[in-house]
Amino acid sequence: MANFDFKETFLNPIFKGNPISVLVLGICSSLAVTVQLKGALVMGLSVIIVTGLSSLICSLLRNTIPNRIRIIVQLVVVAMMVILVDQVLKAYAYSISKTLSVYIGLIITNCIVMGRIEAFALGNKPFASLIDGIGNGVGYAMILVIVAFFRELLGSGTIFGFQVIPQAVYDFGYMNNGLMILPPMALILLGCIIWVQRSIQKDLQEK
């Protein structure tokens, strides 16, 4: 069991060990839910909740789970959290839930959630596991929000559905970039984020 450092455990997955831009995990949702900021933000918050609580519960159960069925137990715990989040969204934010459709359910198979349970929660105390799960969720959500910000702004001229580019700009001939709302642009923007991060953090560059 590693010594628990709150700052390192929480901040490392946001920056140096970001699950998307560094570990390249969970990138499918960067294609699916980043056309609009609202959907990306809700998806990010959902992953934060699921990852944090799943890591906490699995850490609490780590000494009682037989090794041969640990993956099954982890999947049950994650599925339970995902169903809970999905039902809350359907009850209180139905329009967003309908927009995200099956992608909330696919959190169950997200490599980040299962990866943190296997790599951290099963070998550390509950509070440390909770912080690690939340940190990884925040790192995931941050990338989604950045990608969605540029896709919505440049592709639709809006932020959270509100028009932010003045009509006068359009009158001068400006047009929204239709390419931004196409799925491939999410990967291109993600590639730009990875390039910028590795340009700043030299230790991430491959030798």
Task: Provide a role label for each language-model segment.
Residues 1-11, 201-207:
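Intrinsically disordered, low-complexity non-transmembrane regions of multi-pass membrane transporters
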Residues 12, 59-63, 128-136:
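Short amphipathic alpha-helical coupling elements at transmembrane boundaries
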Residues 25-31, 47-52, 79-86, 108-112, ...:
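Hydrophobic core segments of alpha-helical transmembrane domains in multi-pass membrane transport
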Residues 37-53, 73, 97-108:
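Structural signature of hydrophobic alpha-helical transmembrane segments
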Residues 54-67, 114-124, 198:
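C-terminal ends of transmembrane helices
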Residues 65-78, 99-105, 132:
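Cytoplasmic-side transmembrane-helix entry/capping segments in multi-pass membrane proteins
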Residues 84-99:
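Transmembrane alpha-helix boundary signature
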Residues 160-179:
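Short, membrane-exposed interhelical loops at transmembrane-helix boundaries
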